[in-house]
Regions:
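Structured C-terminal helix/loop/strand segments within mature extracytoplasmic catalytic/sensor domains
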Residues: 34, 92-97, 101-246
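Active-site-adjacent helix/loop patches that line small-molecule binding or acyl-intermediate pockets
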Residues: 5-88, 94-98, 106
Length: 246
């Protein structure tokens, strides 16, 4: 559209993709990106991959649309070439916590009138369109994973996803100190329990929120080289204890 506003059909697809995690809607979006014809979702996946790689994201690709039996060759990346850890990634759709976190960071920066996307696509993208993208991402509201680590009235936009062995979530949260991004993928061989990933993500999210809230209030976070206290050490009072009244 001339004013950058998605038409009704595209808006519905975006809403279903983010709010409902609909693979069907995501495939139709890929079809639009690929040109709009039947089967163009394959070209859309390739175009998306080429665009992201052109922005420097070498660990992100999509060679096959969702829920399809037809398969293509996988892509070799720096991440999947590192055999230190085997997280059983999907052979046809991959990213990393860093890559997806950068994409969200770029969208936020674009919505504020600066950053990588506006520089890379001059005249093709506007801050308003990037804000609309954040609004669609913000439709993912379930109070799970990273969401549970921040106060309920916090402004945020996040997108989660999961398979049997891995759970992931990436979000931008507006703290008193400004927006910050948390991107976290957790893998466990065999089966990733929801209770485990939920607890870890809630703790990480709360720690990030507490850190930026402390900074906003003028507090000094501990130096990264400060040793943690010995949990076995005896507890000593740091302030006088008022005697109980007789």
């Amino acid at each position: 559209q001339e004013d950058g506003t998605p038409d009704i059909e595209t808006s519905k697809l975006l809403s279903d993709t983010f709010a409902l995690s609909s693979n069907f809607a995501a495939n139709l979006m890929l079809r639009q990106i690929g040109g709009g014809g039947v089967g163009a979702e394959w070209q859309g996946a390739l175009k998306m991959t080429e665009t992201l790689r052109g922005l420097g994201l070498q660990n992100t690709f999509m060679t096959t649309p969702y829920d399809t039996e037809r398969q293509t060759q996988t892509m070799v990346t720096p991440a999947n070439s590192d055999k230190t850890w085997d997280t059983e990634p999907d052979g046809y759709r991959q990213t990393t916590a860093k890559d997806i976190g950068l994409v969200l960071e770029w969208i936020v920066q674009c919505s504020q009138g600066g950053g990588t996307l506006l520089a890379a696509f001059p005249g093709q993208l506007t801050p308003n369109e990037c804000q609309q993208t954040l609004d669609y991402i913000a439709l993912d509201r379930n109070r799970i994973l990273l969401e549970t680590g921040v106060p309920p009235d916090t402004r945020y936009a996040h997108k989660h996803g999961f398979v049997s062995t891995a759970h992931g979530d990436v979000g931008v949260f507006w703290s008193p100190a400004g927006p910050y991004i948390v991107s976290l993928f957790i893998y466990k061989p065999g089966w990733m329990e929801w209770e485990l990933s939920s607890s870890i993500m809630a703790d990480v999210s709360k720690a990030a929120w507490d850190y930026f809230t402390l900074v906003a209030n003028g507090g000094q976070p501990p130096d990264v080289d400060t040793p943690l206290p010995d949990p076995a050490a005896p507890i000593t009072a740091t302030a006088p204890i008022t005697p109980a009244a007789p």
